[in-house]
């Protein structure tokens, strides 16, 4: 009874019931009803006062003309019409600009901006992806240890677009490769599961069929999801372009990926969670695999010209050089040899970073014949190479424990008795539910290939590397000027491997086929002189040359022991042509054993590598969620970056007191205008904040209810599983006792039997040891029920409080309207246009006065330029013989002479030249703001000419006499900045 009294009641009162969801028609009817009530009221809340708020006429029922104050009454009618027209034109221009911006496809839409953190893109790029927690989401979550579907949003329905500008600013047109640990963890679980049950699998027969077949075959599909504060950027459009072209060899050091369109999601696409090595994948993965066939960007590349490079550019995903497929932290997953086809290091393993760029794409098998590439029957002596490519995996392939033919229509299927996971093999027998001998046409296949010379940006054709004794001097067969970066500058007239001395000083090997087609160029910075000195130092090569002899298609040198030099295994120079001595584009002087420049593989990938490739279209980012309050905008948007966005700093003049008075007056007007709305806004914010907080509390309470319900459901499920286990136990015991297969007794929950051991091991008695009793389970259910009832009541109360607070918001406005006389408070608002017009007029008058003041100041400064007219008296030479002169004695060596001061008036052209020179040397000429003052120069010239020559040009200067002695002439100061007239 005590438990029943303490048990909370499940009944709720009527106000706790959540309101039904209103439809749009109900909302519209309520608005119309309120409008009609407002129309019936002839007066406001205060008697005798008009309503001060604005009502919206939705249905057009308000037809009465309300007398309004015309703010343009004092103005002239034409002035009002002009202003009205200008406003309309401005509005049309603004709308046109808005529509033009919206129609631009590469602009950032409003819903595409993520302003979450203080960085340009609204997110932070996560480089160490191994530190990011991840979980899987699948349908059979209880069986495979994943989260249920719906725990994370569907990426196809809920996503956020990222603009192209943000992608370029964050990733710098470089979508990097990431070695995700999530597929490695799945691979580790599969390996651990196989090792723990390896002994049991060896004893199985062909009658064994388990649900684990779906996991092995990759039919358990799910998504990888990252929790908050992480997210995934899913690329929707991308292309590749070369970077860091080696000027010596011509190969591209890097192939970068430029993603131009991406979405922010929480989960990846669906993919098989775990599987073993296979060849043909499910058709559900075709679109995802096809997306990795990345095309070249629309830039000027030689491979894009079909005439120069048949077949176009390479398509696929370039795994960069230096990538680690299995990092050092998980090196125990590496096998002795690579099981990933062409994805291998220089030693054929995965212990070192990749030394050559590896391309992975979905294979196009439309041109194949019987599971073999085109022209496969034309290969020489049954080799695996054709058209410069060595093929691996053509013939029989390993697919889910079976050897099947590479021909999808062949239907060949042989069981091997083992599964391949990474670099290890595990014996395992199972009877698959799928038909192994079916027609696999239409199922996607991975194609792994490597361009060893890495010149994908020049051509997609693979060539067979030339032997050194087949490299000869061209002798006129090569014309033009070309290099390793410019293959189109030369022309060839004969097939062969021509040694060419380029104009840049290095050596080139131009590979010419079909008499006129250049299929490749290999180069080095070593010049001809250095090479020839090495050649002459070779034994018995003093009288030899590299001239072409023989009648073969490619030609050869005369002496095979005196071919193009190279370094042997001891790093010493030699000229002997060996059987496996080829020349490579990236190793001109080394001994290269690889005959073909390309390597291709079909299949050979397990689920780990399959997931790794599909995950390359995703990048992990770090974000933060929106919160209540003000959202902090990114700092980069607040600061103007770059020289083009920086405003020029100018020295400010002293502000007079009138400016401060005007500023204070404007601030007072603005403060008065916002005083009335400030009180109402404060009250509304207070009630709104309370309502939002109540809604948040209600949401939190409902979240607790959901968590308690989920815990209760889990507990119920646990009880059901216990019940199922016990029933299964009883059924097993009954069956065994009926058929007399078991004769045992129990002792402390353990079974002691004298029958066959395999029968006793079939019943795992220890799994039922720690099961709880039904009384304990009932008590826990009762506790869950009581907790859930309390939480439901608390949630209902919080919802009721939130609804009450939300209904109080309009009541606050009515209370304020009843308390204050709003109509009289805002009666002065009708004079605001006049005040604004007055302020604008004062500002315009002030600007005009400033312009006039500047013009007057400039006029005075230019007008003050004067030219001093001086008379230079040339003294007569001194008579040393003391001869007596006619006009004086000359006893002191100087004479008193009288000269007429002759002055000539300057012409208009002279005045103009002097004025123009003064303008050119003044600082006003270098400032664009003072350039308009140049229009005043003609007026100044005319004014000065009139002052000098008079209004009629008849001013006469009187002749003056001036006595100048020697002392005065010697002590005359130097004239500076004056024009001297002789």
UniProtKB/Swiss-Prot annotation:
Nucleotidyltransferase keyword on record: no
Extracellular side: 107-831
Annotated stretches, region: Immunosuppression: 723-738
UniProt entry tagged with the keyword Endoplasmic reticulum: no
Domain of life: Viruses
Function: The surface protein (SU) attaches the virus to the host cell by binding to its receptor. This interaction triggers the refolding of the transmembrane protein (TM) and is thought to activate its fusogenic potential by unmasking its fusion peptide. Fusion occurs at the host cell plasma membrane.
Subunit: The mature envelope protein (Env) consists of a trimer of SU-TM heterodimers attached by noncovalent interactions or by a labile interchain disulfide bond.
Protein name listed in UniProt: Envelope glycoprotein gp160
Gene that produces this protein: env
């Amino acid at each position: 009874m005590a438990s029943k009294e303490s048990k909370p009641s499940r009944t709720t009162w009527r106000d706790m019931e959540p309101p039904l969801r209103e439809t749009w028609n109900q909302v519209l009817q309520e608005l119309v009803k309120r409008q009609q009530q407002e129309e019936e009221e002839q007066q406001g809340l205060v008697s005798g006062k008009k309503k001060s708020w604005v009502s919206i006429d939705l249905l057009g029922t308000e037809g009465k003309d309300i007398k309004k104050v015309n703010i343009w009454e004092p103005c002239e009618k034409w002035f009002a019409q002009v202003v009205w027209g200008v406003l309309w034109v401005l509005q049309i221009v603004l709308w046109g600009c808005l529509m033009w911006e919206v129609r631009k496809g590469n602009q950032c839409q409003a819903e595409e901006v993520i302003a979450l953190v203080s960085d340009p893109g609204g997110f932070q790029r996560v480089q160490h992806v191994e530190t990011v927690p991840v979980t899987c989401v699948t349908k059979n979550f209880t069986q495979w240890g994943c989260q249920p579907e719906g725990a994370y949003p569907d990426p196809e329905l809920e996503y956020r677009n990222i603009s192209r500008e943000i992608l370029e600013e964050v990733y710098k047109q470089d979508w990097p490769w990431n070695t995700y640990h999530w597929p490695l963890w799945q691979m580790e679980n599969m390996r651990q599961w196989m090792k723990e049950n390896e002994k049991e699998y060896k004893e199985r027969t062909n009658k064994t069929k388990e649900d684990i077949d779906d996991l092995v075959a990759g039919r358990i599909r799910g998504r990888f999801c990252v929790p908050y504060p992480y997210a995934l950027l899913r690329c929707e459009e991308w292309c590749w372009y070369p970077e860091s072209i080696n000027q010596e060899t011509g190969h591209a050091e890097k192939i970068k990926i430029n993603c131009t369109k991406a979405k922010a999601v929480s989960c990846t696409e669906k993919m098989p969670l775990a599987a073993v090595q296979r060849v043909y994948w499910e058709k559900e993965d075709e679109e995802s695999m096809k997306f990795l066939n990345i095309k070249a960007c629309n830039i000027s590349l030689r491979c894009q010209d079909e005439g120069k490079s048949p077949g176009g550019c390479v398509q696929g995903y370039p795994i960069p050089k230096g990538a680690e497929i299995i990092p050092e932290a998980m090196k125990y997953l590496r096998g002795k040899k690579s099981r990933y086809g062409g994805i291998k290091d220089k030693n054929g393993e995965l212990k070192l970073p990749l030394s050559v760029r590896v391309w992975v794409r979905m294979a196009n098998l439309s041109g194949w014949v019987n599971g073999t590439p085109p022209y496969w029957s034309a290969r020489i002596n049954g080799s695996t190479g054709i058209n410069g490519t060595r093929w691996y995996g053509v013939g029989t392939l390993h697919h889910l424990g079976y050897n099947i033919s590479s021909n999808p229509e062949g239907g060949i299927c042989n069981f091997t008795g083992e599964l391949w996971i990474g670099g290890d093999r595990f014996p395992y027998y199972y009877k698959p539910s799928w038909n192994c001998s079916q027609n696999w046409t239409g199922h996607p296949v991975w194609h792994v290939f490597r361009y060893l010379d890495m010149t994908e940006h020049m051509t997609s054709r693979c060539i067979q590397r030339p032997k050194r004794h087949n490299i000869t001097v061209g002798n006129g067969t090569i014309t033009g000027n070309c290099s390793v970066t410019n293959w189109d500058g030369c022309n060839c007239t004969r097939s062969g491997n021509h040694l060419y001395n380029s104009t840049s000083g290095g050596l080139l090997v131009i590979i010419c086929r079909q008499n006129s087609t250049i299929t490749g160029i290999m180069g080095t910075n070593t010049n001809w002189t250095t090479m020839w000195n090495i050649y002459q130092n070779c034994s018995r090569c003093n009288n030899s040359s590299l001239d072409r002899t023989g009648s073969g298609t490619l030609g050869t040198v005369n002496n095979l022991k005196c071919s193009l030099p190279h370094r042997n295994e001891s790093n010493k120079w030699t000229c002997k042509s060996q059987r496996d001595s080829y020349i490579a584009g990236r190793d001109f002087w080394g001994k290269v054993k690889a005959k073909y420049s390309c390597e291709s593989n079909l299949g050979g990938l397990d689920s780990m590598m399959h997931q790794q490739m599909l995950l390359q279209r995703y990048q992990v980012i770090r974000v933060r969620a929106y919160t209540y309050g003000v959202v902090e905008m990114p700092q980069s948007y607040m600061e103007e970056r770059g020289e083009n966005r920086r405003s020029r700093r100018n020295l400010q003049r002293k502000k007079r007191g009138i400016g401060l008075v005007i500023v204070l007056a404007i601030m007072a007007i603005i403060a008065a205008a916002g005083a009335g709305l400030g009180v109402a806004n404060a009250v509304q914010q207070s009630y709104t904040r309370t309502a939002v907080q109540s809604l948040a509390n209600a949401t939190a309470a409902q979240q607790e209810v959901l968590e308690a319900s989920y815990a209760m459901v889990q507990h119920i499920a646990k009880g059901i599983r216990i019940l199922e286990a016990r029933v299964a136990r009883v059924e097993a015991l009954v069956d065994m006792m009926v058929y007399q297969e078991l004769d045992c007794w129990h002792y402390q929950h353990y079974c002691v039997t004298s029958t066959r051991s395999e029968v006793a091991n079939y019943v795992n008695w220890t799994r039922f040891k720690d099961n709880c009793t039904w009384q304990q389970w009932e008590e826990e259910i009762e506790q869950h029920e009581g907790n859930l009832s309390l939480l439901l009541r608390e949630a209902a109360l919080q919802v009721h409080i939130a609804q009450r607070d939300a209904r109080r918001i309009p009541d606050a406005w009515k209370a304020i309207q009843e308390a204050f006389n709003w109509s009289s408070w805002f009666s002065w608002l009708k004079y605001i246009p006049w005040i604004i017009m007055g302020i604008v007029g004062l500002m315009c008058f002030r600007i005009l006065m400033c312009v006039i003041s500047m013009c007057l100041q400039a006029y005075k400064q230019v007008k003050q330029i004067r030219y001093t007219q001086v008379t230079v008296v040339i003294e007569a030479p001194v008579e040393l013989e003391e001869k007596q002169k006619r006009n004086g004695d000359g006893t002191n060596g100087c004479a008193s002479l009288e000269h007429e001061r002759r002055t000539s008036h300057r012409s208009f052209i002279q005045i103009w030249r002097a004025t123009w020179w003064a303008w050119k040397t003044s600082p006003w000429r270098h400032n664009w703001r003072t350039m308009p003052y140049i229009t005043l120069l003609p007026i100044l010239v005319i004014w000065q000419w009139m002052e000098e020559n008079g209004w009629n040009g008849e001013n006469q200067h009187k002749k003056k006499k001036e006595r100048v002695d020697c002392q005065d002439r010697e002590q005359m100061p130097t004239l500076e900045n004056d024009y001297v007239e002789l």
